[in-house]
A protein has these predicted regions:
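Glycine- and charge-enriched loop/helix tracts that form the active or gating conduit
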Residues: 1-157, 161, 165-183, 187-206
């Protein structure tokens, strides 16, 4: 994947194109045939990350939603990490990176764990959809309406992506038992609620 014109000009004119390039690489990749962004374009993304400050949260969220309904969204978040974009788009996710060690005891690397969980959720959901085992439940005119679900649930995937973001704030080392992350789920829920103030739909699905 490359830009038709000079990448610095392309990305500076509309910085959302940087995130869109990552989305295209993710959506078009298969295990047998991965798509990649050419090195020149990747380097340009890193150089132009400061331009992302002009983007609205809504435009970024729209691209992230499209990434999350792909089969292997971990590709996108790995590319965001590689270019430095993750700190601009989802700093809470970037803070999961790394392993701290005390007395020779470390904890699991939570960033790679999160991406593995996300891809597994996507794989299992897509398998269940293909087999017709997922349904939508609605109330219409006081009647129950149940329909077979044919599309991915983006909120399920957001939950998988953000399920451990409370771990850095809750991390403690106990010489008796090792590393703990007590109440990380509640801390993470509050982080989501605080960052999504004003977006009632997202909070209903995620923070609650």
């Amino acid at each position: 994947i490359r830009t038709p014109l000079d990448p610095d000009t392309t990305y500076s004119d509309d910085p959302l194109r940087m995130l869109r390039a990552i989305r295209f690489a993710t959506k078009l990749s298969t295990p047998e045939r991965p798509f990649r962004i050419v090195d020149e374009s990747l380097a340009s993304i890193t150089r132009n990350l400061h331009r992302m400050q002009i983007l609205s949260k809504e435009r970024i969220a729209e691209e992230l939603n499209k990434i999350l309904v792909s089969s292997r969204p971990s590709i996108a978040f790995s590319l965001m990490d590689k270019t430095g974009m993750l700190e601009y788009v989802l700093p809470e996710l970037a803070h999961l990176k790394g392993v701290e060690t005390q007395e020779g005891r470390g904890h699991k690397e939570n960033f790679s764990h999160t991406l593995m969980v996300l891809d597994n959720v996507c794989r299992l959901e897509e398998k269940a959809i293909a087999e017709g085992r997922l349904c939508n439940y609605d109330i219409v005119d006081n009647h129950e309406v149940i329909t077979v679900r044919t599309e991915p649930n983006v909120w399920l995937r957001w939950a998988a992506l953000l399920h451990d973001i409370g771990k850095p704030a809750s991390k403690r080392y106990d010489p008796q038992i090792g590393w703990t992350f007590h109440s990380h789920e509640f801390i993470g829920g509050k982080m989501i609620y605080d960052s999504l103030k004003g977006d009632d739909d997202a909070n209903v699905h995620l923070a609650d």
